[in-house]
From Swiss-Prot:
The chain crosses the membrane at residues 4-24, 28-48, 60-80. It is a multi-pass membrane protein. It is an enzyme of class 7 (translocase). Its EC number is 7.1.1.-. This is NADH-quinone oxidoreductase subunit K. One of its GO terms (molecular function) is quinone binding. It is found in: Cell inner membrane. Gene3D superfamilies: 1.10.287.3510. NCBIfam families: PRK05715.1-1, PRK05715.1-2. It comes from Proteus mirabilis (strain HI4320). It catalyses: a quinone + NADH + 5 H(+)(in) = a quinol + NAD(+) + 4 H(+)(out). GO terms for cellular component: NADH dehydrogenase complex; plasma membrane. The lineage of its organism: Bacteria, Pseudomonadati, Pseudomonadota, Gammaproteobacteria, Enterobacterales. Keywords: Cell inner membrane, Cell membrane, Membrane, NAD, Quinone, Translocase, Transmembrane, Transmembrane helix, Transport, Ubiquinone. Belongs to the complex I subunit 4L family. The gene is nuoK.
Length: 100
């Protein structure tokens, strides 16, 4: 069995990597990937904690996090396609430009 500290450290490293990708990248696709990494790292922390204490709550939260990630990915990819159709660009800075 993997120790609790190792699993939580891995989840924290993945969360920091996802947050870094979310903050530093200006491409919407990479921002969505970073957000997915963050959601999966939180789900990993739930599973590791649940297996350490012998509870099934961590696995239930994992199922909830995966369904949340699927909904977020479908909405995000739909927005990504619309942005690419209208701007021919996935740069998030083009969205904040005002028309006129």
């Amino acid at each position: 069995m993997i120790p609790l500290q190792h699993g939580l450290i891995l989840a924290a490293v993945l969360f920091v990597l996802g947050f870094t990708c979310l903050v530093l990248r200006r491409n919407l696709l990479f921002m969505l990937i970073g957000l997915e990494i963050m959601i999966n790292s939180a789900a990993l922390a739930f599973v590791v904690g649940g297996s350490y204490w012998g509870q099934t709550d961590g696995q239930i939260m994992y199922i909830l996090a995966i369904s949340l990630a699927a909904a977020e990915a479908s909405i995000g990819l739909a927005l990504l396609l619309q942005l690419h159709r209208h701007r021919q660009n996935l740069n998030i800075d083009t969205v904040s430009e005002m028309r006129g």
